Amino acid sequence: MPTVANEQFDYVRIDTGGGVFTNRDLEARSITGTSFSVIEGTDDFLYLGDDAKFDMAVFDIDTPGSYTAPLKYEYFNGSTFKEFIPDTQEFNLDDNDDGTYSGEAYGFAGDGVEIFPVRVISDWAKTTVDEGQSAYWIRISAPNGITTGATVKNIRKRPVEAYCTTQEVFELLQLA
């Protein structure tokens, strides 16, 4: 069981098409916020990578973005990047209880979070996308259109190691 949880991503990359990556590690870690652009074109990707699994990204926005929903989220499943629906994009039953669904996905329009449900991406595997870093990667894009690309001051994560499963507590207490 890991003993240290860090809230900074190990790797943050921007791919502006064709596999040309820009390293944004330092900017994403900056506490005071050194703004950088993310997803300015429909063929751009924001890559969030870490040596350990994570289940949430926290975005501190400088300039709000305007994207045609929904954004596309992908993870590497051992052979390819596979699309998944983050928790904030899951729809909830309306209050009027008529069986219809509503919901609003996070879209870089302001500070916010996106949750990557480990239950959905259970086959998440490490891969290398740039400069030889093998990591767990989440890839975000806006293939449906962009009016204004967002600029971000920093991006933080919630590592899966930030909490224990009941099995890990059981093992820690040596009840097995």
What kind of region is each of these model predictions?
Residues F45-G49, D97-G145:
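Beta-sandwich interaction modules
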Residues S66-F116:
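Non-cytosolic beta-sandwich-type ligand-binding/adhesion modules
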Residues D51-Y73:
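A short beta-strand element within beta-rich, extracytoplasmic domains
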Residues M1-Q8, T16, V20, G78-K82, ...:
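Conserved short "hinge" loops at termini or chain/domain junctions
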Residues R24-E27:
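Intrinsically disordered, low-complexity acidic/polar tracts
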Residues T32-D51:
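Short beta-strands within extracellular/lumenal beta-sheet-rich domains
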Residues N144-K157:
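Edge beta-strands of jelly-roll/beta-sandwich modules across compartments, strongly enriched
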